[in-house]
Structures are given as structure tokens and as C-alpha cells.
Amino acid sequence: MPIITDVYAREVLDSRGNPTVEVEVLTESGAFGRALVPSGASTGEHEAVELRDGDKSRYSGKGVTKAVENVNEIIAPEIVEGEFSVLDQVSIDKMMIQLDGTPNKGKLGANAILGVSIAVARAAADLLGQPLYKYLGGFNGKQLPVPMMNIVNGGSHSDAPIAFQEFMILPTGAESFKEALRWGAEIFHNLKSILSERGLETAVGDEGGFAPKFEGTEDAVETIIKAIEKAGYKPGEDVFLGFDCASSEFYENGVYDYTKFEGEHGAKRSAAEQVDYLEELIGKYPIITIEDGMDENDWDGWKQLTDRIGDKVQLVGDDLFVTNTEILSRGIEQGIGNSILIKVNQIGTLTETFEAIEMAQKAGYTAVVSHRSGETEDTTISDIAVATNAGQIKTGSLSRTDRIAKYNQLLRIEDELFETAKFDGIKSFYNLDK
């Protein structure tokens, strides 16, 4: 039977050694689902609230016992006593949203609500004897995503003196996900050897990318291009580049202040100058995607950027849209960006996540399913990417098990789909004039 008989949460650790929420759901027939909730380092101010305890004597205030308590003492009784079916995802998600009663899930915590939402879906898939991607996407989910591999970390994700948070490679010329992953791994290892030859640090940051002390942004880009070529691939043909500027991290009082991360070598740019700078970079290098090129509240700047280069480059809103359909709807109406980053914990339920993806795709925007810098062994985002035919996934570099787990899950899915599996490569960027 599909009736949920038990919902239980506990405090566990994420990839940074910080507490996070794990939730387990059990049905009367024995179907079981478990979910672990990710956490971000650079967060948009409009994100759903991640509930932390604030008790400095425990995990430096980052404990999640209150969120765990909210699952065990508030959400669980509602679900169990209400005799909810594990197959009724939308009703359960809506019930939790109403139970919280705030616009940002600040009462119960998005980390509490999301853990339950995903665990319910996993238990439903288990009940039906289906893989999660098939339960979520039905027979239509068969497109493997182009991986955006964050092989150099800057900004808030490392100690490197570079403002941009992520430098990514996208193996769009590969014929399958398996091949794209191999290309990425080969480029990653070639980059490591180039860094070693230069006497640069090869330790990795939160998302598994290198965080060496490059001389600046262009040094990082040119070094990545050398690694692509050394691995035997052609930049701008086999493999493209991407940035996550995370501009909100260095924007203040109308100024994009690169000195925050780059010291005396950094520039201070107005919105117009920031647009000029990004346009200059895409003219010089094979860049296909830029995330958060402008501050989340600089909508005028975003409009300038979209009008200037939005037909040539994917412009992804992360802090801008925070997986929120209300904000995305406004962006679509005003012609802001052409893509949304999808992070399940920014909004807090699977139902709302799928609504955001559907809205984006209907408007001709791409949807990039993404991890967070604080991750776990949970691989739900891999299944979501395939279930929704998102076409793109961002889940870190080619090291650290918390990142590789997602890639390995995609390999399994591709194997399972066999001849029905699709990998569209460059065609996944249907929002551009290619």
C-alpha cells in the first residue's frame, strides 16, 4: 500500500563538514526513500530560508536540530495522521508549504521541507520499482545533460585571487554523456599537470576544481584552453568555456568591485563597464555560458547585458531567479537573461522545482540543473536533469566523491536507457543563435 507510515529526520554532515538534514520516508508496504539536503556558500537574498540553529557552542551555530525537529514533530505527524499516499507528491508539497505559511519557508525551513519532498519521491519510485528519473519524468525523460564542469574555482569558493567564482568546461562536441565525462576528466588531469609545471597549487576547492593563484581571470582562461588543447580537443568546437561570475558577491553601491577578491590588481566597474568587459571576454574566448554576470538586484544591468550578448551566449540567472517562478516570470516578461539555474534548495520542494523548469522551457529559456557547494552523496539532481530533459547539469569538477556521485549516476542512467538515451550537445543551447 502507498500510505506513508513513518517520516524521520536526522542531522548529518555535508561535504564541507557542516550539518545538514537527512530525511527517511517509509510506507506501510515497506517502500523506502532517503534524501540529503545540500547547502550553498554564495546565496541569493531571495532564496528560501535554510534553517540553522545559531547556537555558537555547537557546530559554530550551523547545527540543524531545529529543522530536524520541525520534520519529526510538525511535518511527520501531519503526513502520517493525514494518511497521505506516497504517490501524491503535489498534495504533500502543498501541505508543507501551507503548514509553513511564510513566503520563504522561514518557519519550518526549506532544508526541512525539501528533505521530506525528495524522500517522498524516492519512496514512491521504490514502491513502483522504478528508477527515480523514470518516476519523475515518465517515458519522456531520456535526454542526458551536457555537464558544466567547474575545473577552476575562484571567488567565495576558494582562496584564489580571482573574482569570478567558477571557470567551467562544457564538452558539447561529445557524442554521449559517457564520452563527455571522459573528455572532461582528461582535460582536468592535463590542467593539473600544467599547474604543477608552473609551480602552482593543485589542491581543490569546495566543488573539486583547482584554486591556484593565477595572475588574473585571463590567465585562468588561457591556462584552461591550454589544458583542452593538450588533451587533444579543440576549444570552441569540441569544448566550450563558461563562467559563474557570482557578481552579487562583489557588487556594492552600484559598483562591480573586483578588488574585493583581486586586491590592487582588480578593477572597479560600473554596470555599463561590466557589460563591456563581459562582451570583450566572449569576443576573445570560446565562452558559451555566463552565470550571474550582473548583480541579482541590478535588473537594468541585466537588461543591458541580455540586449548586448543574449543571442550569442547563454545568460544564466542563479541569484537573479533563485528557482522562483514569480521572479522568473518577471524576467521572462522583461527579457532578462535566457536561462535559469535550478537549485532544489533555493525553492524547497520538488513540485516548485518542476514548475520553474517547465516555465523556463515554455518561454524558450534553458534550465540548468545544479548542485550546491555544500553537497552530499545524494544524486537526486542527476535524475531530475534526465526526467525534465533539462539538457544541462552543473555538478562540479572531476574530483571529490560528492561531485563524482552525480556523474556516476548519470552514467548508470545512460546505460539503462541504452538506445533511447539522447545527448544533444550543442543543441542543448536552444536559446542561442548558433
Swiss-Prot record:
- Per the record, the domain of life is Bacteria
Provide the protein's localization. Cytoplasm; Secreted; Cell surface
GO CC aspect terms? cell surface; extracellular region; phosphopyruvate hydratase complex
Do the record's keywords include Metal-binding?
A: yes
Q: Which UniProt keywords apply?
A: Cytoplasm, Glycolysis, Lyase, Magnesium, Metal-binding, Secreted
Where do the annotations place Mg(2+) binding?
D244, E291, D318
Catalytic machinery residues: E207 (proton donor), K343 (proton acceptor)
| Residues reported to bind (2R)-2-phosphoglycerate | Q165, K343, R372, S373, K394
What Gene3D superfamilies would the database entry show?
A: Enolase-like C-terminal domain, Enolase-like, N-terminal domain
Please give the pathway this protein is involved in: Carbohydrate degradation; glycolysis; pyruvate from D-glyceraldehyde 3-phosphate: step 4/5
User: What HAMAP family does the entry give?
Assistant: Enolase
Primary role: Catalyzes the reversible conversion of 2-phosphoglycerate (2-PG) into phosphoenolpyruvate (PEP). It is essential for the degradation of carbohydrates via glycolysis.
Protein name per the record: Enolase
